[in-house]
């Protein structure tokens, strides 16, 4: 493989689309806390002065949508009208209805193990050995930058920061191996009274340098910090936000393929979410077992059918065993039916709001990041 560049981006928790994702998942968590068997599809729209929460829910639980919404916005940091968006004064509109009985009859079964998929679709999981969390480096460090922005904003280190921010990191590769960072972009919302010089110095010294490994930076690395020169108007005032619009940020930063389905606001019966988590679990364990340096798995489903309609694996020439053997091992050691994968990863519980900012993958607090199958996969592969 020749020399090449690869870029991934991330956005902060205060980005309008991420506000929407977090509200949708906060509603989901509140419902699952009372009713683990609930069916939830919650979508959120945010714009200046308002939040619209809609979707379809089937549950025995009652939750206070308005209070959940305000609490989520408050925790993100939109707490004053001078930001253009205030958790305590924004309007909250509730347009949630019931899930279609046509979907219910396709999903629910007398035998829970035969629960059908909540929809058709294809999902991908991916892992590689570029980082210690077995994720691509560009998305890993793009997330780390905006996570650091949030930390220094909230702890007062840089008090002039505001919640909305974006990052982008370009890595240079030679023969598939990282040789450095070519470019870094970080744009952050800020108070009107901070100078561009102070902002650039603060971001470089407090956010960028502590996050990016020094061995990957050199005299030719390009830095673009608030390149427009001003980012005072941000959040829902600057752009409207919608649930599910940051699917590449949420996954692998473009280094793996994507089936198109978003995650936030969906309960585990929706394979868009749960099967993508299971696919990451499979791919990560294959790489952790040393069976490949890079692994991408695709699974697909038909609505109302429990068994996946297909499983395929690609190791990009890095596999230590055949891809046919890998598929056989996956079928032997992983449960990919909707009910089974929900049980395997313990997904029917309120763990989702934390996933809705800074990526769903590469964070070891989540069950689909465990590598507990690596040892048996390696043994059964004969390595």
UniProtKB/Swiss-Prot annotation:
Catalytic activity: L-methionine + ATP + H2O = S-adenosyl-L-methionine + phosphate + diphosphate
Record-listed ATP binding positions: 15, 164-166, 230-231, 239, 245-246, 262, 266
GO terms for biological process, alphabetical: one-carbon metabolic process; S-adenosylmethionine biosynthetic process
UniProt cofactor(s): Mg(2+); K(+)
GO cellular component, one term: cytoplasm
Record Pfam families: S-AdoMet_synt_C, S-AdoMet_synt_M, S-AdoMet_synt_N
Cofactor descriptive note: Binds 2 divalent ions per subunit. Binds 1 potassium ion per subunit.
Primary residence: cytoplasm
Transmembrane segments: none
EC number of the protein: 2.5.1.6
Pathway as given in its UniProt record: Amino-acid biosynthesis; S-adenosyl-L-methionine biosynthesis; S-adenosyl-L-methionine from L-methionine: step 1/1
Residues that bind Mg(2+): 17
Location within or outside the cell: Cytoplasm
Family annotation (SUPFAM superfamilies): S-adenosylmethionine synthetase (SSF55973)
Keywords assigned by UniProt, alphabetized: ATP-binding, Cytoplasm, Magnesium, Metal-binding, Nucleotide-binding, One-carbon metabolism, Potassium, Transferase
Region (Flexible loop): 99-109
InterPro entries per UniProt: ADOMET_SYNTHASE_CS, S-AdoMet_synt_C, S-AdoMet_synt_central, S-AdoMet_synt_N, S-AdoMet_synthetase, S-AdoMet_synthetase_sfam
Family under the similarity heading: Belongs to the AdoMet synthase family.
Self-association and partners: Homotetramer; dimer of dimers.
Protein task: Catalyzes the formation of S-adenosylmethionine (AdoMet) from methionine and ATP. The overall synthetic reaction is composed of two sequential steps, AdoMet formation and the subsequent tripolyphosphate hydrolysis which occurs prior to release of AdoMet from the enzyme.
Protein's name according to its UniProt entry: S-adenosylmethionine synthase
């Amino acid at each position: 493989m020749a020399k090449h560049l690869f870029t991934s981006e991330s956005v902060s928790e205060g980005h309008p689309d991420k506000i929407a994702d977090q509200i949708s998942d906060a509603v989901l968590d509140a419902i699952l806390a009372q009713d683990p068997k609930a069916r939830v599809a919650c979508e959120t729209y945010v714009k200046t002065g308002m939040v619209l929460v809609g979707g379809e829910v089937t549950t025995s639980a009652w939750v206070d949508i308005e209070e959940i919404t305000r609490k989520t916005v408050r925790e993100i940091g939109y707490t004053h009208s001078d930001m253009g968006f205030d958790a305590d004064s924004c309007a909250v509109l509730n347009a949630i209805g019931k899930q279609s009985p046509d979907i219910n009859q396709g999903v629910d079964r007398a035998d829970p193990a035969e629960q059908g998929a909540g929809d058709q679709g294809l999902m991908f999981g991916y892992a590689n050995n570029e980082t210690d969390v077995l994720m691509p480096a560009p998305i890993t460090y793009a997330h780390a930058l905006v996570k650091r922005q949030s930390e220094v904003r909230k702890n007062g280190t840089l008090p002039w920061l505001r919640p909305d921010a974006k990052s982008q990191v370009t890595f240079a590769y030679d023969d598939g191996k990282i040789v450095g960072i070519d470019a870094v972009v970080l744009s952050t919302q800020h108070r009107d009274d901070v100078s561009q010089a102070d902002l650039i110095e603060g971001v470089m010294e407090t956010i960028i340098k502590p996050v990016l490994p020094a061995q990957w930076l050199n005299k030719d690395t390009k830095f673009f910090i608030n390149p427009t020169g001003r980012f005072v108007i941000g959040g829902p005032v600057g752009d409207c936000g919608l649930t599910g619009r940051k699917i590449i940020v949420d996954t692998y930063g473009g280094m793996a393929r994507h089936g198109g389905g978003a995650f936030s606001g969906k309960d585990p019966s929706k394979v868009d979410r749960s099967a993508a988590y299971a696919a990451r679990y499979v791919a990560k364990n294959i790489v952790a077992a040393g069976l490949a340096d890079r692994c991408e798995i695709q699974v697909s489903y038909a609505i109302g059918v429990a068994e996946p309609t297909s499983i395929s694996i690609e190791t990009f020439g890095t596999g230590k065993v055949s891809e046919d053997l890998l598929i056989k091992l996956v079928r032997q050691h992983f449960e990919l039916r909707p009910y089974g994968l929900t049980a395997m990863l313990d997904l029917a519980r309120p763990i989702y709001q934390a996933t809705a900012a800074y990526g769903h993958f590469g964070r070891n607090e989540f069950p689909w990041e465990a590598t507990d199958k690596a040892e048996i996969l390696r043994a059964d592969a004969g390595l």
